[in-house]
């Protein structure tokens, strides 16, 4: 049986596009998202087992929420 997720993948994709558009370097923002996801995965090992959002998606959501802070995506 497939688990039902409480998040909208279209919204996560839109947020990812916003992050990429706001950044001057696409590679750098991708690496930042990956590093944050890796850090989150280490902290929350059983996150997926509880039906939560994947670490990469959670990192995208967090970073898009922080767009107002230029040090997150700044050069």
Swiss-Prot record:
Q: Which family does it belong to?
A: Belongs to the RNA polymerase subunit omega family.
Keyword set for this entry?
Answer: DNA-directed RNA polymerase, Nucleotidyltransferase, Transcription, Transferase
Transmembrane portions of the chain:
none
Q: Name one Pfam family in it.
A: RNA_pol_Rpb6
Question: Which GO-annotated molecular functions does the record name?
Answer: DNA binding; DNA-directed RNA polymerase activity
Q: Please provide, in alphabetical order, the Gene Ontology terms of the cellular component aspect for this entry.
A: DNA-directed RNA polymerase complex
Q: What does the record give as the organism's lineage?
A: Bacteria, Bacillati, Cyanobacteriota, Cyanophyceae, Gomontiellales
Tell me which domain of life the UniProt entry assigns to the organism this sequence originates from. Answer: Bacteria
Subunit structure, interactors included: In cyanobacteria the RNAP catalytic core is composed of 2 alpha, 1 beta, 1 beta', 1 gamma and 1 omega subunit. When a sigma factor is associated with the core the holoenzyme is formed, which can initiate transcription.
Question: EC class of this enzyme?
Answer: transferase
In UniProt terms, what function does this protein have? Promotes RNA polymerase assembly. Latches the N- and C-terminal regions of the beta' subunit thereby facilitating its interaction with the beta and alpha subunits.
- One example of a Gene Ontology biological process annotation: DNA-templated transcription
* Protein's UniProt name: DNA-directed RNA polymerase subunit omega
Quote the SUPFAM superfamilies the UniProt record gives.
RPB6/omega subunit-like
The family database entries (InterPro entries) matched by this protein are listed as: DNA-dir_RNA_pol_omega, Pol_omega/Rpo6/RPB6, RPB6/omega-like_sf
EC number annotated for this UniProt entry = 2.7.7.6
Reactions the enzyme catalyzes = RNA(n) + a ribonucleoside 5'-triphosphate = RNA(n+1) + diphosphate
Q: Which organism is it from?
A: Cyanothece sp. (strain PCC 7425 / ATCC 29141)
């Amino acid at each position: 049986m497939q688990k039902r997720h409480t998040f909208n993948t279209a919204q996560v994709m839109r947020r990812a596009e916003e992050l990429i558009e706001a950044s001057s370097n696409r590679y750098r923002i991708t690496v930042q998202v990956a590093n944050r996801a890796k850090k989150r995965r280490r902290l929350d090992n059983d996150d997926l087992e509880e039906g939560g959002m994947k670490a990469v998606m959670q990192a995208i959501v967090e970073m898009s929420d922080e767009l107002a802070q230029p040090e997150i995506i700044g050069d």
